[in-house]
A protein has these predicted regions:
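Active-site-proximal loop->helix
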Residues: 109-122, 142-148, 156
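Anion (oxyanion) recognition and catalysis
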Residues: 91, 120, 202-206
Length: 236
């Protein structure tokens, strides 16, 4: 039986969810953003760990996170971000009719090994899931305040980009573009792929692929032009 090939590229990381973080507290206010893109925390938005450390002068894992969570462990650790989660769902729903492949990278650390073991329990083809030696696996600390905004609740995200800094378009081989469907998802958390998005989309179209782009909070472009919309690719 012929199977449709679906290939997705983007970020794959560990989400660590911390509940009951008080966004109205004096301590949270210490790390609150003063202006858009400055690296401080903003309810409902994402910042990078290194940007938050530069903004505050404090280490995230050593000081900021233990303070905000009162030393609690995460309530939930799970596979995160839109790309790999969407691909897992596609592989579950259409496993008879499709071959679903993930293109991405992880670090050579224990977190990456644990993530790989979880992914191996799915129907994904992981033969293009690379190891970036000497790098840590990407993760996001999700700070949740269920009482924020008059009980509507909100989350704040601190992303450790890790190995994803080093994943390049040149590392993506021809098999990706030989797919009936090419998915680009959450690429703002894989900066080099995001910067090369236009070229990769054109190449996929030249091969006759259906292309799908899913977005995620783009901190780098928010920092670069806080008053402008985020560009998608070099021809936007």
């Amino acid at each position: 039986m012929y199977k449709v090939r679906i290939s997705g590229i983007g970020c794959c990381l560990v989400d660590r969810i911390y509940d009951r973080v008080d966004f109205q507290s004096e301590l949270f206010g210490k790390y609150l953003s003063k202006k858009a893109g400055d690296g401080g925390l903003e309810p409902g938005k994402l910042t990078f760990e290194e940007e938050l450390e530069h903004f505050s002068g404090d280490g995230f894992l050593a000081k900021i996170l233990p303070q905000l969570t009162e030393g609690r462990d995460p309530q939930i650790e799970s596979i995160g971000v839109p790309c790999v989660v969407a691909l897992i769902n596609a592989a579950q729903l259409a496993w008879r009719e499709s071959e679903v492949c993930f293109y991405g990278c992880r670090g050579d650390d224990g977190v990456g090994e644990d993530l790989l073991q979880k992914l191996q329990q799915t129907n994904l083809d992981l033969s293009h899931y690379r190891i970036q030696e000497g790098s840590e696996t990407a993760s996001t600390s999700v700070l949740s305040d269920p009482n924020f905004d008059n009980g509507h609740g909100e989350r704040t995200f601190v992303n450790t980009i890790g190995a994803s800094w080093h994943y390049l378009p040149e590392e993506v081989d021809a098999s990706f573009y030989d797919s009936e469907i090419c998915v680009f998802s959450g690429t703002a958390l894989v900066p080099r792929i995001h910067q090369g998005l236009s070229t990769m989309l054109r190449k996929a179209k030249e091969h006759g692929s259906i292309t799908i782009v899913n977005t995620v909070y783009d901190f780098l472009n928010q920092k670069k032009n806080p008053e402008q919309r985020w560009p998608m690719g070099d021809c936007d």
